[in-house]
């Protein structure tokens, strides 16, 4: 089985490079950088940049309308693993503000959940087409037939079968659509296996019960500095935008 870890970023950060270099398991380690120039080298991490115009013209666009740039790093990641190198059986996609609690977490989660086509936080369904319940439902209108499904996918694992179905969608429509709807919806539409591991349930935003572990500052939530006892092995946490805390809290 051939697997990859793809960390999505604007540009490399030493914390993320170190994390990828130290990850356990037999993975290709890829950092997909949205900027055209990287200026970083590593013996075990491959740094990939993709020209905006090429990605857009090939139909890999519109995956994240929440950011001003189109194509986004997500569009480029789909372009790379759907067209440039579709050889991987499984690919982990991880945004740079996701904190992975251990260098063993990905291989451990892979071992637990086996051959699912999509590992993600949730798989919420809408069947009636009413878009008032969630701001982003409108992004599915005229892009895919009902039912629609959603999940935060800032950390997710995708199979070769699902990547092929995403490629088929681009080939037929010459576009993508909002990532938090598209990935789950295409998976479910094609009767693929979607699993929501407990290890991904700390991917926010969602309500917290008991002790607060996030703070709201300057219009955004982020994880506050706290005791290492709050970090659970194999869990993924989002958002943690202070990259220095990744090194501080990582268990090994």
Please place each PLM-identified region on the residue numbering.
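N-proximal low-complexity "stem/linker" segments adjacent to membrane-targeting elements
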Residues: 1-14
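Short loop->beta transition adjacent to catalytic acidic/histidine clusters or analogous donor-positioning motifs
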Residues: 2-3, 24-31
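Short, polar loop motifs at secondary-structure junctions
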Residues: 12, 32-39
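Short, well-formed alpha-helical segments that are part of the catalytic scaffolds
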Residues: 12-24
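Active-site-proximal specificity loops/subdomain of glycosyltransferases
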Residues: 36-87
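Short beta-strand-to-loop acidic/aromatic patch adjacent to the donor-nucleotide binding site
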Residues: 88-97
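Conserved catalytic core of nucleotide-sugar-dependent glycosyltransferases
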Residues: 99-185, 247, 251
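C-terminal catalytic/acceptor-binding lobe
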Residues: 170-252
